[in-house]
């Protein structure tokens, strides 16, 4: 079981790999498709299983993730299973999925203080553990 499922666009892979490394260094167990989906498996079914098994859903906001049909499916599956949503702004984007607008975002853009905001993300992952345990 993972602490957090990471939803992102493949075009943002360098940032997501760095973020995954930072989360792992902070004793978190992030789920990412490049390391958690075996070859020849039904990749979408594995993604859905990863979402269902995770405590939280981290959506990396960028123009590419916002435009991604797969990311939209992941968000909808997350909502269907009442998972905790954590929007993380990596790049400014328009037309963000409606459900993300109801949540307070974390900002890990290049202009932001990455280390300070990473600590906010870690705190957010640790907050409201009763809710996380229920779902």
Model region roles, listed by residue range:
Residues 1-26, 41, 45, 89-135:
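C-terminal interaction surface of TIR/SEFIR-family domains
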Residues 9-11, 37-42, 63-70:
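Acidic, metal-coordinating catalytic cores used for nucleic-acid/nucleotide bond scission
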Residues 27-37:
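Conserved RecA-like helicase motor-core motifs
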Residues 54:
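An anion/phosphate-binding loop that grips the pyrophosphate of nucleotide cofactors and donors
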Residues 57-58:
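Hydrophobic acceptor-binding patch used for acceptor engagement in glycosyltransferases
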């Amino acid at each position: 079981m993972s602490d957090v499922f990471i939803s992102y666009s493949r075009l943002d892979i360098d940032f997501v790999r760095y973020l995954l490394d930072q989360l792992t260094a902070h004793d978190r167990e992030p789920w990412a498709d490049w390391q958690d989906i075996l070859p020849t498996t039904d990749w979408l079914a594995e993604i859905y299983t990863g979402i269902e098994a995770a405590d939280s859903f981290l959506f990396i906001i960028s123009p590419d993730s916002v435009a991604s049909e797969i990311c939209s499916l992941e968000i909808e599956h997350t909502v269907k299973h009442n998972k905790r949503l954590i929007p993380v702004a990596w790049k400014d984007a328009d037309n963000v999925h409606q459900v993300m607008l109801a949540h307070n975002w974390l900002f890990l853009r290049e202009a932001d203080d990455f280390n300070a905001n990473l600590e906010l993300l870690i705190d957010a992952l640790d907050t409201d553990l009763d809710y996380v345990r229920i779902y």
